[in-house]
Amino acid sequence: NGKTDPGCRVRVNCHAVPGVWQYEALAFKPGLVMRWFRDGFCQLEKQQAEATGKDPYYLMDKEAAKVPAGCYGMMCTFSDVMNFISWKHASPTFTNFELDPEKFSRYTFYRAILENTAMVTKGHLELVKEATGNMPQEIVFAGGAAKSPLWCQIVADVLGLPVKVPVVKEATALGAAILAGY
């Protein structure tokens, strides 16, 4: 049986496989925020990507990797550890930055978004551990996140856990196919 979290901080879902439970902590905005940032502030990268056949996120990551961890003290809050019953989200903010374009370029802001998602992931894992007594030994990134070595590394550094990326990065279709044959 799946143990529920009385505080409703972790959602417990039955799995498609009988007797298996999924503990889920929710962070709704990371992918949406990254798309918003790309579309709103990285037109140059989108144009370069179109011209070179590269993904714009690859180009953004390449530059954001040059920004030191911690983003010169700037913090981003777009997603937060949340209680899924209340569906409340943090107000989107960037704080503690200066008007120094050498340090605080769009890539610093982008990296701060990546770091925010890593901190939210850490908070969610701590909630799952409180609810279940278990902590994963590794993290598996799939979907869009799996395409970013920088994001994988930031999450690995924040969690102190290895982040693995499967060969098949689009896990939804693969999972559906596996379950269809189950």
Predicted segments — roles?
Residues 1-54, 70-98, 104, 165-168:
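Glycine-rich phosphate-binding loop of actin/hexokinase-like ATP-binding domains
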Residues 4, 21, 145-146, 177:
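Gly/Ser/Thr-rich beta-alpha loop segments that engage phosphate groups in nucleotides
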Residues 11, 23, 62-65, 127-128:
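Generic recognition of flexible, low-complexity loop/linker segments
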Residues 32-40, 127, 154, 175, ...:
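Alpha-helical scaffold segments in soluble metabolic enzymes
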Residues 38-39, 45, 49, 129, ...:
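Residue-level preference for well-ordered alpha-helical positions
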Residues 52-68:
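Short, well-structured alpha-helical segments that form the helix of a local strand-helix-strand
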Residues 66-174:
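Activation-segment/catalytic-loop signature of the eukaryotic protein kinase fold
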